[in-house]
A protein has these predicted regions:
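DnaQ-like (DEDDh/DEDDy) 3′-5′ exonuclease domain used for proofreading
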Residues: 1-118, 123-176, 276, 498, ...
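Conserved S-adenosyl-L-methionine
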Residues: 59, 133-140, 171, 198-203, ...
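Phosphate/ATP-binding catalytic cores across multiple sugar-kinase/actin-like superfamilies
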Residues: 99-102, 109, 173-178, 184-187, ...
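Conserved proline-anchored active-site loop of SAM-dependent methyltransferases
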Residues: 112-130, 207, 422-438, 509, ...
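SAM-dependent methyltransferase catalytic-core segment centered on the flexible catalytic loop
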Residues: 113-190, 198, 214, 239, ...
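Signature of N6-adenine DNA methyltransferases within the class I
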Residues: 174, 187-188, 197-263
């Protein structure tokens, strides 16, 4: 059995990258466990670019971005049940806090688990708020911003275009967040980023640097304001962009979506026992392909006197080749083997005195690719404002220019399936959560969401921060659906929809456990304060549930992992994922409680350090008990 201390820091990104390199190139490891880059160059040979001048994107502050990425977070996420809806059932999360810190905290439990990311970051129009990160102590920086600690002269302001580092500030804000977000995407995951012309060029270069140019999937143009902005300088801008990248290179058609009912009705006019279908010509209608370069797709198909189709010659049948009207020798779209195996789908029709071969294309599962210009009225900003106003029952602009729900639903249809997870770490008014809930209610896609929003002040009395608006909007979406469902099928009977019909609120905060501050003054008072941690290392006013969720998250489990409370001989313990992990956050533990936990044979157990009260014998007996029960790892915190 392994024994150790639970790390209270977020994942060490740099260390993970080093381990990945050493796994691929073990011959580059030095005696001290470092990487010999000269050896790495020799291993890679001609693949290494040793020139001084290289094409790439650089800007003032880029080096600090890497320091931000590599500096671990010791923060935690506190559960806020009173602001949640069906906390224990829902798999949706709304997290209030600085998204950089939150993204770091999500690295352990959500790496490679997010299928889709959508963000609508500040457009950098000259009046946008750009959150000033601090690579030395970003959590303290966040607490100062939210007024949780004092800081004389701390200045948070908009990113004015008169500032000489106007573009650099925007890049410095976005780069580390995108870098961390990429780690959360699964291999076939997709990220969509809204922007306008102010930073489009920089955003594409930034995405090439973080995700790789080969994973670019395209740039969508969204008609968001048909009238155009009359205050613009030269042209009345009426569009925005969505830049789309994959976590890896995706196959053709990976983002196709199901055709709408009206489109099916219009396009699929034939019907048989297999359902609605349309006829598509089997001959390749692109003239650049033909017998000259696709000889395997040139073969005869036979049509008998009653129009029956076969790939084999029958008495009296006519031989049909994929010829163009001018005699050009084209080719079929199917190979001979496929035509033989699926000959029941082939249909012959006489056109202008000549036989042509068609194939049946059924409407069931029919897909279409999104056009690169999204011009439907459901995507307009005005539509987003109507959706928002309908929920809040007011025409007052509580939130400026919320994204259209229809736009987000369409993007989700390209990427999500039942059980998938979508992340939005610039959540704003909560359109992403709204769209995900709507798709679930319509029984089209049952996906979960994580929304992250900074508690940016609004200056209002009712909704004091943007994150308050985020939570209230999603709350109202759920309430609206429940009212509409009254008298219909009980949501409890719909299983997953009930489970998705809620959200858990978490709030960014300093760790529940007082940790050594590496940035403290080295004076006597500073050292004395740090020494106090050895006496009482748990923050005051923190609950058992607060402690549990920090341990859960830092043990590499998602915040929505299956959890069961149970009684262990008079004390409460938490079982995670059917005893894969058992956590006990009681301040005092007994031998009987240890025995009760050991009987469940968990894979891993975690206790508080102080639970053993300095009783080395009790702790030693606990270790022996757990080892006998087959526990693989025993940790304390």
């Amino acid at each position: 059995m392994q024994e150790g201390k639970l790390s209270l820091e977020s994942k060490d990104i740099a260390a993970e990258k080093r381990q990945e390199l050493l796994r691929l190139f073990p011959e580059t490891q030095t005696e001290g466990g470092r990487i010999d880059f000269d050896q790495l160059k020799r291993v890679l040979g001609e693949s290494v670019d040793t020139g001084r001048e290289r094409y790439g994107m650089n800007w003032p502050g880029k080096a600090d971005c890497f320091r931000l990425i590599q500096s671990p977070s010791t923060a935690t996420l506190l559960p806020v049940r009173e602001e949640s809806v069906r906390f224990d059932e829902s798999e949706n999360l709304i997290i209030e806090g600085d998204n950089l810190e939150v993204l770091k905290l999500l690295q352990k439990g959500y790496q490679n688990k997010v299928k889709m990311i959508y963000i609508d970051p500040p457009y950098n129009t000259g009046n946008d708020f750009i959150y000033p990160d601090d690579f030395v102590d970003n959590l303290k920086n966040y607490l100062q911003y939210t007024g949780q600690v004092d800081a004389e002269g701390k200045r948070f302001s908009t990113n004015l275009d008169s500032d000489g580092r106007f573009h650099s500030k925007w890049l410095n804000m976005l780069y580390p967040r995108l870098y961390l977000a990429r780690n959360l995407l699964c291999e076939d995951g997709v990220i969509f980023i809204s922007c306008d012309e102010n930073e489009l060029k920089n955003l594409i270069q930034l995405m090439d640097a973080v995700f790789g140019e080969s994973t670019a999937l395209g740039t969508l143009t969204v008609l968001c304001n048909p009238k155009g902005r009359s205050q613009d300088k030269y042209f009345a801008t009426n569009h925005e962009y969505i830049v789309v990248y994959g976590r890896s290179i995706l196959p053709k058609g990976a983002l196709a979506i199901e055709k709408k009912d009206d489109q099916v009705e219009a396009e699929y006019g034939e019907e048989d026992e297999g359902g609605k279908y349309r006829l598509l010509e089997l001959r390749n209608t692109h003239r650049e392909f033909g017998q000259h370069n696709r000889p395997n797709l040139w073969y005869p198909i036979y049509v008998d006197e009653v129009g029956a189709v076969s790939t084999e010659m029958t008495h009296g049948a006519i031989e049909v080749h994929p010829l163009w009207d001018d005699g050009f020798r084209g080719c079929w779209t199917w190979g001979l083997e496929k035509a033989e195996n699926e000959s029941e789908l082939l249909v012959a029709k006489e056109v202008k005195g000549k036989w042509k071969i068609f194939r049946k294309s059924y409407a069931s599962g029919a897909e279409r690719m999104l056009k690169s210009i999204l011009s439907e009225s459901d995507f307009y900003t005005e539509s987003g404002q109507r959706d928002f106003a309908a929920l809040f029952g007011s025409k007052e602009k509580i939130f400026q220019s919320p994204k259209a729900t229809g736009l987000l639903k369409t993007l989700m249809e390209t990427s999500l399936k039942d059980g998938d997870l979508v992340l939005d770490f610039f959540a704003g008014s909560g359109t992403t959560g709204h769209a995900a809930l709507r798709l679930s209610e319509e029984e089209r896609i049952d996906a979960s969401f994580i929304l992250v929003q900074l508690p940016e002040p609004t200056g209002r009395d009712d909704y004091k921060s943007i994150s308050d608006i985020t939570k209230e909007r999603v709350r109202r979406v759920i309430q609206t659906h429940e009212k509409q469902s009254e008298g219909k099928l009980d949501l409890q009977q719909k299983g997953q929809s009930r489970r998705k019909g809620g959200f858990r609120v978490f709030r960014l905060a300093p760790s529940n456990f007082k940790v050594w501050d590496a940035h403290t003054d080295e004076g006597l008072e500073g050292v004395e304060r740090q020494m106090e941690l050895a006496v009482n290392h748990i923050m005051p006013d923190r609950t058992s549930e607060d402690l549990f969720y920090e341990i859960l998250m830092k043990s590499e489990y998602p915040l929505t992992a299956k959890v069961e409370n149970f009684d262990a001989s008079g004390i409460t313990a938490f079982s995670v994922e059917d005893d894969a992990l058992i956590v006990c956050v009681e301040r005092k533990v007994t031998a009987e409680a240890v025995t009760a936990i050991a009987k469940r044979s968990p894979s891993k157990v975690i206790f508080l350090d102080e639970a053993f009260g300095g009783n080395d014998q009790l702790k030693a007996n606990a270790k022996m008990n757990f080892e006998s029960a087959g526990v693989k790892r025993f940790e304390t915190v």
